[in-house]
Structures are given as C-alpha cells and as structure tokens.
C-alpha cells in the first residue's frame, strides 16, 4: 500500500513475541538507536537487502489463520520513527486485529498518538540502561535521549495499555548497580514495583563485532544477576515490597 512503511520481514505465527498470545510478527526497517548488541542491524543499515513483503499478502496470510492468531506484533528496527505508523496500524485495526508495538521509547509524541487513537493493545518497551545520559548513550548510541524514554514510560504508566519492560543484559555494558537503578527508576515512574523482562545478550552477529563474547550470560548467571540487582534496589531504600519509597 502506497505511502506506508515497507514491511521488511514477516513471521506468520510467533509464540514468544507477545506473552500469552499467538501473533504474526511484522518487521519495519531503520532505527534511531545503535545498540552495540543489536542483532537486527542489517535491517537498520541495509534494509534494501531484504525482501519487501506486500502488505496485502501479509493481511491475506493472517486472515487465513483467523481464529488461531490473536493479533500482530509490529517491531523493527524502530517502528515509531515512521510518521506513517498510525495509518499503518489502522490497516490492522480496521480488520479487527490486536496490535502489540515493540519500541525503544524514543518517540513519546508518536507513542501518545497511538495510545490516544486506540491503535495499540499492548507495548513492549526496551529500557537500555538507567535513565541517565552517560549509560544510555553508551548502550544505545550517542543520539539516544533518556529523557524521551522517561516520557514514554510516564505515558504508559498513565495509560491503560498493558506495558512490558525489557532489558538486555551484557555484563560489559550493564552492571548490577545499573540494573538496580533501572528497577528503582521504572518502579518510581509506575508507582509500584514494575517487573522487567531481563534478556541475556546474544553475542553472535552483533552491530559491534568487537563486543566481548564473555559478556553474554547463561540463564543461571542472568538469574543470579537479577536477584542481586533486586536485593540492591531494596537495600538502597528506594524500593520496598509494596513499591517505591518517597
């Protein structure tokens, strides 16, 4: 469809992208972040090397699975950099599909428009680091603005749209103390303890090929780091079992 973002990847049925849902996955090109551990970097730097899926084909393949699919996850890249994103999502909503948006939170104005327009049923927002300039730009690139990410989190905290927060852990890029600050900062924004989906960093085929391989955590190590961070957040005096303290 003319004027809409190009679809550069399509998974007909996904079981892990939207918790508790069976959803198709649509990939949009380009991104305004440059995370060193990004494994979709060719979708960002060279999207023309990927096939473009006709949106009508995507819709037809989804329609054939109606009754089995719950909806579609729109991911990237970073979907919110596309000014035509609201019109793109309307195509799915008009066909009675629920939409989950994956975002880095860098465009709160666009996120607010999507929320106000009823165009998204859920959001997964990637929190790259504590909401502070130095660690955020280290983990997401020099153009990353943690203040914009904070505004996106505040929008989600005020809305009724279910929000999942995700953080990728590479021990060379994120310390336990920084993980603890992510916990306290996001919990303060949401007014209660906000669970985070911690993800081990996959170090094969990353944007930064020099990213140390030993920074990737296995499941056991990641669980230990998360427990340490949660305990540190509690002992810091900023987080209690019932939520953040004033």
Give, region by region, the residue ranges found by the protein language model.
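Auxiliary Fe-S-binding modules of radical SAM enzymes
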Residues: 1-16, 20, 173-246
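SEC14/CRAL-TRIO lipid-binding/transfer domains and related phosphoinositide-recognition modules
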Residues: 5-11, 30, 43-44, 57
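Canonical Radical SAM [4Fe-4S] cluster-binding loop centered on the CxxxCxxC motif
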Residues: 18-53
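A secondary-structure boundary/capping signal
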Residues: 27, 75-76
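Conserved alpha-helical substructure of the radical SAM core
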Residues: 41-72
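Short glycine-enriched, charge-decorated loop/helix-capping segments at active-site entrances
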Residues: 42-49, 136-143, 210-216
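Hydrophobic alpha-helical segments typical of transmembrane helices
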Residues: 54-58, 110, 225
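Conserved AdoMet/S-adenosylmethionine-binding subsite of the radical SAM
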Residues: 59-71, 80-207
